[in-house]
Amino acid sequence: MKSIELLPTKENIFNTLIDDPFGRDEEMASFLNLLTTIEGHFVISIDGKWGTGKTFFIKQCELILNTINDTNKLTTENKEKILHLPFLSKESLLGKLKGQNCVYFDAWANDDYEKPILAILNTLISKCSFGKTMPSVDLTQVENLIEEMGNKFFTNKLGISVKPILETLKRPGSKEAEDQKSLHDYIEKIINNLTPDGNRLIIFIDELDRCKPSFAVKLLEQIKHYFFVNCNNKLNT
């Protein structure tokens, strides 16, 4: 028996955005417009039953934002198709969404990782790397990836080293104020790199309801603690 499930592949995300078989243009326009009107840190929850297309919805929003901000690898023809979607012009969203940078984080794919903050940092570093898409890696290699890529990129571009940060993260139960401040400073520099000229960073966190409860709670706690407390009102999730 064949499955009739439409998987959220890049091709399906693009085609359903262009053809709009689900009739979601108005909802997407309203959501994207909302992102441009609320100031400061905020969290938006997209709720729906299993199979209603939440992943499709946020990945289509991600595709639009990345296309407008020229941070994906679409062909010129496909970029033009997205940029000429009627609802973007109707709501004047092309100008409003310029500078609204975003990253996509699959929480379920990372829920066997002890420290969610490392997986999120890996996602952000990948986004920082000159718009290049980094190869997927096994979660057990995330620390090595951050150290290898982060040291090379952030030492050269931002004048900081990730090694002290990794040591902070590896110390179980480390609560020293100095360690916490170092990590806050490091994350703030990453976000500043992703949000030049006072732009905004949007993090789409998907599949949170499929995670282990302990991981979901820890993920939300670390996002609040490390991102919302000290990021200059540039972050939305």
Residue ranges of predicted features:
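Walker A/P-loop-proximal flanking segment of P-loop NTPase domains
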Residues: 1-92, 102-103, 118
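Short, flexible loop/turn elements at secondary-structure junctions
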Residues: 8, 48-50, 107-111, 207-215, ...
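Active-site-proximal structural scaffolding
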Residues: 24, 39, 54, 98, ...
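Hydrophobic/aromatic-lined pockets within catalytic cores
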Residues: 36, 66, 125, 129, ...
